Curated annotation (Swiss-Prot):
Naturally occurring in which organism (per UniProt): Brucella abortus (strain 2308)
InterPro entries in the record: Rossmann-like_a/b/a_fold, TilS/TtcA_N, tRNA_Ile_lys_synt, tRNA_Ile_lys_synt_N
Lineage: Bacteria, Pseudomonadati, Pseudomonadota, Alphaproteobacteria, Hyphomicrobiales
Protein's name according to its UniProt entry: tRNA(Ile)-lysidine synthase
Catalysed reaction, written as an equation: cytidine(34) in tRNA(Ile2) + L-lysine + ATP = lysidine(34) in tRNA(Ile2) + AMP + diphosphate + H(+)
SUPFAM superfamilies assigned to the protein according to its UniProt record, in alphabetical order: Adenine nucleotide alpha hydrolases-like
NCBIfam families the record matches: lysidine_TilS_N
Pfam families tied to this protein: ATP_bind_3
HAMAP family: tRNA_Ile_lys_synt
EC number, UniProt record: 6.3.4.19
Family: Belongs to the tRNA(Ile)-lysidine synthase family.
Gene Ontology MF annotations: ATP binding; tRNA(Ile)-lysidine synthase activity
Keyword Phosphoprotein carried by entry: no
């Protein structure tokens, strides 16, 4: 008896989408996904359009032909198919990570172009076990949040849901399914190349591991992650726990922080460091412990710089403070029609007809700007503006946001951006991301 498409896909609610993107490389996992998904969608009264997308990473001479063969197979079975190519220069280091980033960027663009609400991938139970073992080897201990491994659901770029419905299905079960259907697959030789981390793990520790035991450890890590998240969600429900000013400095109530468990404190302060620094990931486990020790008064320094964030311990009842450090702040062009993220902290939309440069103001430049506009800003607020974006036009400082009554160009909109959540949001953290956004908000107010 074969696999049940209904049991596999029904929990994901794919029927509410206009279209569904299936990521298909031509390997057994993705082809198994494609044909099971096709069968499932055929059971729906008004099924979404199924579009198979093959990303050609241009890393092997055979990849173009393999992508073409996937297209021929799809044509034979009445499935829409397109090929997207990663044509950018390839990095000398971190190739696998760069390829993964490019792949998801291309898949998200394909989903947006097609109006698809879902991208569905063929990650299997085997991949889940390998992911756990890889992350455990990197972290060096059994309490890392990443040991919850891959979430069945994630949100990409704030708009497209990533579904991994095969995380409880083995690779062999998919191959048996394809064999039963008479469908051949291609084995990518890079999957056996031990120069890459995953093949090393697959051919090494994963081959020797007790799969059921690993899956139990994944479940335990997931439960621990949910407990820490739930503690933060509860804390964030109290408005007194966390505040933020217009420029993004955050104020963490020291008593509320101290009342949390050590694990929740490490998560909370690490999360705020990531937000303040505009980073897409949490600081490492060791860095999170270091922040927690400093804020809890166990280490002597009253301030730390971590992940681009300056963190200061509050004394005598004062809140702990998290803000961006004043280094490595970017300069970006903002042209008409553009949507751009600045420093991982602010999102700009330009629907007007003027072009600008986004950059932090220089100190004397800001002082002169404030003087010429008749404003007197105290030093603390001035420091906040020095780590904030300003708009330059023709090489001159033209607009400074967050000032009371400040002029602002027509058609330019700015809002807060959470890099750690807004690009890839694992389903494990959906509730936590919602709680953070509810407490900090997206709107940018005036400096007060």
């Amino acid at each position: 008896m074969g696999l049940s498409p209904v049991n596999i896909f029904k929990p994901f609610g794919l029927g509410r989408a206009k279209a569904v993107i299936a990521a298909v490389s031509g390997g057994s996992d993705s082809l198994g996904l494609l044909f099971l998904l096709k069968d499932y969608l055929s059971t729906l009264e008004s099924p979404p359009v199924l579009i198979a997308v093959t990303v050609d990473h241009k890393l092997r001479a055979e990849s173009a032909l393999e992508a073409e063969n996937v297209g021929l197979l799809c044509q034979k079975h009445g499935i829409m198919h397109c090929v997207l190519s990663w044509d950018d220069p390839k990095p000398a280091h971190g190739l696998a990570a760069a390829a993964r980033t490019a792949r998801y960027r291309l898949l998200v663009q394909a989903a947006r172009d097609a109006g698809a609400g879902f991208i569905v991938t063929g990650h299997t139970e085997n991949d889940q076990i390998e992911t756990f073992l890889m992350r455990k080897a990197r972290s060096g201990h059994c309490e890392a949040r990443g040991l919850a491994a891959m979430s069945p659901r994630s949100l990409l770029e704030g708009s497209v849901e990533l579904a991994r419905p095969l995380l409880t299905v083995s690779r062999q079960a998919l191959r048996d399914e394809l064999t039963r259907r008479g469908i051949a697959w291609v084995d990518d030789p890079s999957n056996a190349n031990i120069d890459y981390e995953r093949p090393r793990v697959r051919l090494g520790v994963a081959a020797e591991a007790d799969g059921q035991e690993v899956l139990e450890q994944i479940a335990q890590a997931g439960a621990a992650r949910e407990r820490d998240n739930a503690a933060l969600v509860e804390a964030l429900a109290d408005p007194a726990t966390l505040g933020v000013d217009a420029a993004g400095m955050m104020f963490l109530n020291a008593d509320c922080y101290a009342a949390l468990s050590p694990g929740a404190r490490q998560l909370f302060s690490g999360l705020l460091a990531s937000i303040a620094g505009g980073r897409r990931f949490l600081p490492g486990d060791g860095e999170r412990r270091r922040i927690e020790r400093m804020l809890s008064g166990q280490d002597a320094p009253r301030r730390l710089t971590v992940f681009g964030a300056l963190i200061e311990r509050g004394e005598k009842g004062a809140p702990h403070r998290f803000r961006r450090e004043r280094r490595n702040l970017p300069k970006l062009d903002l042209v008409p029609g553009q949507h751009i993220v600045w420093d991982g902290r602010f999102c700009f939309f330009n629907s007007g007809g003027r072009s600008f440069e986004i950059a932090p103001p220089g100190r004397q430049e800001l002082i002169d700007f404030l003087k010429n506009s008749g404003r007197d800003i105290e030093s603390r607020r001035c420091e906040a503006l020095l780590i904030s974006p300003a708009l330059y036009e023709g090489g001159k400082l033209a607009f400074v946001p967050f000032l009371p009554g400040a002029e602002w160009p027509q058609g330019v909109h700015i809002e807060r951006h959470f890099a750690i959540f807004d690009h890839v949001l694992p389903g494990h953290d959906f509730a936590l991301a919602q709680a953070v956004e509810a407490r900090l908000g997206r709107a940018c107010a005036e400096i007060s």
